[in-house]
Amino acid sequence: MQKNINNVSDTEQKLEITLSAEEFTPEIDLEVENARKTIQIKGFRKGHVPAGMIKKVMGPAIEASVAEKLASKYFVEISESENIKPASRAELENYSFDGDTLSITLSYEIHPDFEVNDFKDYTFVQDIYAVTDEDVEKEINLITKGHGTLVPVETPAEAKDTIIADLEKYDDSGNIIEGQKTENYSFNLEYLPEDNPFHNALVGKKSGEKVTVDIEGKEKGEETYRYEVTVKEVKRLELPELNNELVKEISQEKFDSVEDFRTDVRGQLEQHFSNKSEQDLLESISARFIEENPVPTPSSMVDSFENMLLENAKRQMGGQLPPGMDENGFRDSVRPNAEKHARWMLISQKIAENNSLEVTDDDIKAYAENEAEKNPELNAEELLKTYMSTEFRDYMTDTILKDKIYTIIKSSVTINAENKPLPEHKG
């Protein structure tokens, strides 16, 4: 067997393999024998068709099958001996039987050969969130909103109130547009952006007042419309009294007292923002490494991440993209992100390789025990059994290896903590 490896690009290679008759003839004979068992030719009993006749009838199919099998076999052997790191399946470009030789050409993508730039001087900022009593009360108010009551008020509307109003639409000449009157329209001011024209016009208005709102066309030359809004009612959310009975109802009797409920809310906030702090740090780390290491990415690897992003989007949208959203257009929009995912995978794999990182059974056991400690409802032994199963083993290995890679990075760079207030959210 002779071989010749040609580098097409940083991520592409071609492999030329030349086999002698001694190497491919046994495979030809095996294919002929297998065909003899099933082929039926007039004038011959099944299983007794001469080899020459079989080669005459099935020659091209037999040669194609032999070329495929030998290409696969020798590609594996050569990849191991030459330390080739394929990033895709090898494609059989062409083959030819020429007397006593079989020539095969394979094309495939490879992981690029590169080194990660030194990162010991990198500096990152990690946001640290301290949960205050005020944060806890805000969160409890958000939770109890679903049990609140909207009550009419005579005072001017505030930024979180709801306004019930009638609307009439006018064209830019001041004429009422036929069929464009809406009655009892509900404006929830809390969820309207502060720069929304209706939000600006309605805050401070009372029941019975009228206001005009001009809506400019989004595109140049597009018509401007005017709305006349008659405020019929201003409603304000009145939260229920937080007591033990309400706590039982909200928590489905998980908690009996306000104090226990408040403690749980604080704990969940602390856990959520601790996770956010860590996740934001890891994202900033990967972004910096991607920026500093413009590693060429195999297109097959990028394709894989592109497919993942597409399927994730479909799941979030009920199983398919919305009508009118072009799949090819969506793929084009996420392609740069898919390339970043692929580049970070290559970089992180190189860091793992440089530091001889691996995941052992003991690592998985420790991970299961740690998860069980965080959640008393989980059993460490049952969890370990799940993690070690065929379905979960690869996922757990990837998860733990990722943790080890980030641990190596964090131990080498500078991380400055910065205290931050909890970000506002409306629930």
Swiss-Prot record:
GO terms for cellular component: cytoplasm. InterPro entries: PPIase_dom_sf, Trig_fac, Trigger_fac_C, Trigger_fac_C_sf, Trigger_fac_ribosome-bd_bac, Trigger_fac_ribosome-bd_sf, Trigger_fact/SurA_dom_sf. Residues 160-240 form the PPIase FKBP-type domain. GO terms for molecular function: peptidyl-prolyl cis-trans isomerase activity; protein folding chaperone; ribosome binding. It catalyses: [protein]-peptidylproline (omega=180) = [protein]-peptidylproline (omega=0). Keywords: Cell cycle, Cell division, Chaperone, Cytoplasm, Isomerase, Rotamase. GO terms for biological process: 'de novo' cotranslational protein folding; cell division; chaperone-mediated protein folding; protein transport; protein unfolding. The keyword Cell cycle applies. Its EC number is 5.2.1.8. It is an enzyme of class 5 (isomerase). It is found in: Cytoplasm. Involved in protein export. Acts as a chaperone by maintaining the newly synthesized protein in an open conformation. Functions as a peptidyl-prolyl cis-trans isomerase. HAMAP family: Trigger_factor_Tig. Belongs to the FKBP-type PPIase family. Tig subfamily. Consists of 3 domains; the N-terminus binds the ribosome, the middle domain has PPIase activity, while the C-terminus has intrinsic chaperone activity on its own. PANTHER family: TRIGGER FACTOR CHAPERONE AND PEPTIDYL-PROLYL CIS/TRANS ISOMERASE (PTHR30560), TRIGGER FACTOR-LIKE PROTEIN TIG, CHLOROPLASTIC (PTHR30560:SF3). This is Trigger factor. It comes from Chlorobium phaeobacteroides (strain BS1). The gene is tig.
